[in-house]
Amino acid sequence: MSSLLGIGGGGNVGVAGGGDFYSYSIDQSLRLDGSTAYLSKSDFAASTDTTKRTFSTWVKRGNPEGVGAYNHIIGAGSSAIDGFGFANGTAKLQWLQGGVVTKDGVRDLRDTSAWYHIFTTWNATDNEVYIYVNGELDYSSTNSIDALSKLGNTGHTTYIGKRSNSGVYIHGYLAETVFLDGTIGDVNDFGELVNGIWVPKNISAASLTYGTNGFYLDYADSSDLGKDVSGQGNHFTSNNLAAHDGVPDSPANNWCTLNFNDSRTSLGWQEGGLRWFSASYSYKAFSTMVIPEISDSDTYYAEYHMAADGYSGGIAPLSNSGSNSNTDLTGFLAYAYNGNFYNNLTATASGYDPVVGDIISIKAGNGQIEFFLNGTSVGTPYTGLTGSYKFGAWALGATGNGMYWNFGQDSTFAGSKTGSS
């Protein structure tokens, strides 16, 4: 079966042109659910130099809007905190030092189909701060700054994926997370432009100086997602994470998810855009990636675990999106919790009624759509289809635990079920 192509800018799928495009491939990432999951380390030794810090990570956002104040990727301190992440109520990057909003980036990072490379340096010796996004300078300053005395230093817990003094969590994915203690790094050691696209480089080949408290988290060991592979032994503790939170979604292998920017606001948006539960009838959410032409011989596959009644899944034309996604059902083809097939609001009985806990699979291509219930076909209700489509979730009135989706990256459905594929 075929990979989905990116709808919006920033996604690498369908753009790169095969494995030769990347001189170095990242094969996995850490999924953060946006509600309880994070990494922490409370036993750092004395820092090499708190005036010089370098931080680099790749991030794919799950929910760029529904976050609390100061949504930090990394931070430390219970008060007067040091932290770096997303600013209060925006999708811009921001540094806090000693609890004070210090430096703000310019670019809004809202594309949930995209992997972004974020690189920043803090040099209180020379009063220099730099923030880069995908190799491009996003912010620079030469104004006077103080040391980051809490981040990666003894006496303070450093967090990844959580604001250090509040229950505000990152929702999305992190890959290749690196911290240099006492060293100002070079963004070109972490990525490079290939055909105009910023792609990852092999960090191990860069001869980085990590310092006493530096670390490199590659998230490759699903049994120990906080393992430091820098050689410094600065391992992090996993909190509310499991083996299934190590996923193959990565900057070099970008997977489809549901798209926060192409949905009606819901009660919940978790598990890296793979869990959705709605607040009301007619709410919908669509995939980040598109079936380019459904009449082609390629086939495209997705599945979801029905964790509550009241939900359906299927495909919809690209026109069924954006601001009208909560009202317009034109062309939406679905198999629902009540056993009906739907074309818009026109229902046809399938003869197979799913129940909570079942897995519904969707196979689209060759001009048709076929549905499966726990691996058994329940019919091919719609044929002769043409044009571009995307996968979609549709709530028919219920809330509850919603639905967990799998586009091939997690057959456990975030640990809620064993997949049928």
Regions found by a protein language model. Give the residues of each.
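Low-complexity, glycine/proline/serine-rich flexible segments
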Residues: 2-51, 90-94, 99-100, 154-160, ...
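Short hydrophobic/aromatic patches on beta-strands that form ligand-binding or substrate-lining surfaces
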Residues: 55-63, 118-120, 160, 174-179, ...
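Extracellular glycan-interaction patches encoded by glycine-rich segments
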Residues: 101, 151-174, 396-398
